[in-house]
Every structure is written in structure tokens, then in C-alpha cells.
Amino acid sequence: MSKQAPDYKAKKITQAIRIDGDVQKEVWQQAAWTKRFVDMVSGESGMYDTRAAILWNDTHLYFAFQAEEPFVEAHLTERDSIIFLENDLEVFIDGGDCYYELEVNAANTIYEVFFIWKDAYKKGGKFDIPRFDVHQEQAYTFGGDYDRMGATFWKGTHPRGIRWAFTNFDLSGLETAVQIDGTLNDHSDIDQGWNLEIGIPWSSLELLANGRSLPPTDGDIWKMFLGRFQKLMVGGKEVQPHPAMVLSSHGVYDTHLPEKWSKIQFIH
């Protein structure tokens, strides 16, 4: 994997970052900010300017987002609300036989899911632990975005098949913070947008390491999804599907394709 050309290089820093939503502070000036996100299907420039940056140190992985938004909106405030039905910023981290999904909206509401590919969920294996008991109320089978219809109803269209989705998963030590340049849920003015900061302890990513060292070694590559979904109203009607802006285009409207995610290289 280390021979793959990266889509983004995440620089190592020595200091810790205080997660407060301020992505203009000096430490983020050290980071390489991504290009403007593109449409997930077409690869054309996204409708709003969205960019991200990643930094890391020996203890934490850090993300920052800048999201242009003329009408900053977020009504869902309960943790694990289905915030992708509104507007959100998203990070997915691939762990080979599993992956982690994090979504955050402009109200700093968090939505988390941990996915395990069914073919990797074996009796006595590393996922056969109480935390991932498939008999619990919040464990579901998942075939992928927009796959549950017709011949693909049960298994979806991904060659690997279905996943177990654990919607009660909480990543230990996760920190998120939002700052808004404008007014939330007030359409009487024009906003500039909103910013998001995320901090994740490396110690919480053990299940996603997939044989890699934590923290990473210089040159290691992890696959991650960095994206944004935008609820858009035109003529009083909601545009479906919601416009999706991502770092790396998928060519199809499906977030849950780890093979399409961006290759993030960790460098010293």
C-alpha cells in the first residue's frame, strides 16, 4: 500500500491541538489544505467551496474543515440523529475488515457508526466481543447507499456483500467543535460558512489499524473519506439526492465504497 500515490499528505506536528473549532489558528497554517471538494459522482467542482486539512502527532489524529455556506442550518441536536438528512461534514476511516463513520453538523451534533464486513465477522474472531453483539437492538445489516431495491435488496451491490452496522458505537476520546461565520438557522442574512475541528486519539483506532502501527510510521497510507452532504431546496422542493462534495470522486452516488476513498499519507 505504501507504493500508492497519495491523494493527500498529512504532516506530523509536535504540539497538541486544542479542539475549539478555530481553524485559522497558527497550527493549521502548517497544514496543507486540500483542493476544493468535487461532486461525488461527476468529479466537477463542488457547488460550495469545501476544504479540509489533516495533522497528527504521537497521540492524536486531527481534522479541520472549512465549509462555505450562505445559509448555515442545523436543526438536529440529539446525538446520533440522522444528520445526513440535513447538512453535514463527514469522515470515514477504513480498517480493512471494518470502517468507522463520523458525521458532524453545524450545531456540533455527532453521528457515529462502526461497520464490520459480514465475511470478517467470525466466531472467536477479533470482532466477536460484547461491544459488537449482533443481537443488540442497534445492530443492523447494511448493503450500501441506495442498494436496497430489486435484486440487490438483501446484499447490496458491493462485491464484498453486506456489513454489520453498529449505530450505538462511540469512539473513545473523540472531540469535535464548530465555529460559525454567520448566524445559525437564520435565513434573513447571508452567512460565510462554518468550520469544524476533530480530534481522535490513536489509542481509539486500534480496531482500524489493520496491522499498521499506531501512531503511523512515516509514509504509511490509510484510506479515508472526507466529504460533505448538502440539503438543497429549489422552488420549495428538496433536491434528491442531496448534493455530495468529496475530496476524491467516486463516480457513483455511494459513500460506502472504501476502495474509492482518498489515500492519506502520514509524513514527518
Which role fits each region the language model picked out?
Residues 1-268:
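Structural preference for beta-rich elements and adjacent junctions enriched in aromatics
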